[in-house]
Structure formats: structure tokens, C-alpha cells
Amino acid sequence: MRVEYSKDLIRKGISTISQLKKAKIRVEKDDKKISYKDAKPGKIDVNEFKKAIYLLIEADDFLYKKAPKHELNEEEAKEFCKLIIKCQEHLNKILANFGFEFEEKEIDEGALYIVSNKKLFKKLKNKNPNLKVVCTEGMLDIEDMRAIGVPEKALEGLKKKVEIARKNVERFIEKYKPEKIFVVVEDDKDELLYLRAKNLYNAEKLDADEILD
């Protein structure tokens, strides 16, 4: 009798869990739906609207370049989707002025961000003053200086600067013990910085427009 009662409880428990899971799925799906009928009075953000349009125009080039099949290789797919995602972000900002709510990307304050120049450093700090950002003002290895075309005669004088930059990064790592280390990449020189930091500190790459948009 007790065994049958236990089995019955288990069956009811499984049934309840199943119903809760289904209900949760329905709620999550409903939460993601938006309708123009929910729009509130607001103001068009012209600047964000123009940014979205320019990105779509840039993405539109793929229709002509890849006609008639419109098949993209991996690099092309990344570039195309990057444009579309950035466009979507600008459109979300426009819709936010009309009462729609979107989950914003959170910037990881527990990470360390390595940048190559003071301009990028200031942009990140303006975005979020709490970010841990270290500026190298160049490369982390003299060989990378050579790779970007610095004359041989100038390399000797830059060795000390490179050494200081490296020690500065390591000082930040020791002080903050970051969960992750990112190199913010804006151009080809930053790519070199990223590759070196990946080798030295297991750093990850983060496109500048991903964190600054």
C-alpha cells in the first residue's frame, strides 16, 4: 500500500514538473514577443535611425557582390551578421523611446581590458568608469614593433618602453586577479597586441565596436 502511495506521489511530481516546464517555456516565448500595438508616445532618435540605415546600406552590398546565390563563406558571414546585429542594436535604442524594453549587454567589470592607445582607454572609461583598463601605448614585444614597420635603429630605444608596458599589464593582473583578460581590438596593430597577449596571458579578443556601441 505504502509502495503504491509512493509511486503515485512520484507520478504526480513528474506531472507537475512537466507542467511547470511547459508553462516556463510559454512565458519565456511570450516575453520575447513585441507588438507595434504596445508602442507608447515618444520621440524618434534621428541619430540612431541614421546609424541603422547606414549599416543596412553597407549590408546591402552583399546582395550585389554575392548574387545570384547569396552564399557567404565564414569571414563574409561574420561581417554580414556583424552589420545586421549592430543595426538591430540601433533599432532597439529607437524602440526604447517608445516604451519597449530590451535586455542590454552587460560589460564585465570583473575582467581586465588591455588597449593599445590612450584614445581607446578614454572611450572605455567614459563608457564605464569602473572598468579595469590598462593602456600599453604600443606592443608587448619588440618583435611586434618590428612587424609593424618600426625602423631597426629605433627598436633599441623602444625596448625599455615595451618592457615597462609588459610589467604594467602584469602589475594589473597581480593586483586585480581578473576573471578574464580582453584585448580591445580596433585595427591590425591591435590584432598583433592581442596575439601576443593571448600567448602571454591567455587573453581573449574583443572588437572595439562590440563594447563601445
Curated annotation (Swiss-Prot):
InterPro entries cross-referenced by the UniProt entry: MJ1481_archaea (IPR016736)
Protein name in UniProt: Uncharacterized protein MJ1481
Gene source species: Methanocaldococcus jannaschii (strain ATCC 43067 / DSM 2661 / JAL-1 / JCM 10045 / NBRC 100440)
One Pfam family cited in the UniProt record for this chain: DUF2100
Origin: domain of life: Archaea
